[in-house]
Amino acid sequence: MVPENTLHALEHTVENNFTHFETDLRMTKDGEIILNHDATIDRTTHEKGNISELNWKDLKKINAGSKFYERKDLNRKTSFVLLKEALSIFDKLCFNLDLKESGMAEKVYKIIKETNAEDRTLVSSFSPSRLDEFIELSNGEILTSGSFRENVIARYLPTKNRNFRIQALQAPFIYRGLKVHSRKLKEFCEINNLYLHIWTVNNDEDFDKCLEFGCDGIMTDEPLKLRKYLERNS
């Protein structure tokens, strides 16, 4: 495939006519919001350092996919991407944005507003406090998705209407060996008027299970494989 959360990944998404892109957000030392999963650049590049301790002017010079390209024996470069660039350049894509750190909610909200991306973004976070902060700032103007807190409630209070302020629930297919996906989880979402998105699902057998209990969205590292599966089973 392509190196995650990079310009190459965005280009690949558009070239293959996909409409949605899930990514994670980190903040640089100088306050820029970039697309990246990890707190450091160690795993994906041949450089080292915490993103929170690096300025954007230095990060943008780094080959963001160097380790991926090395594994694939490819002589290629790609770059990290600012959130504001992703939303403005790829203005037909819908984005699922995961707030990975505290202190970025206001910046993310302003960027979404400035790029007129309110109707094509969904903001999520594993941290209830980060998500609550964003919901307060956006006042429901931008779609949000719950995760850990809402999954716990769904597990132990499955028949209750909880009057959530979110519009979707994102749940893992399996978490630490525990099966999370289920028809009961879908029923909980229906009771609470929530869309259900399941992550991370990468093979046909698990695609089958997701569709059997009626999830509304599948997050995958293998979008081409998922597309072929859907074409075969449409």
Where are the model-predicted features located?
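Phosphate-group recognition and catalysis centered on beta-loop-alpha active-site segments
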Residues: 1-234
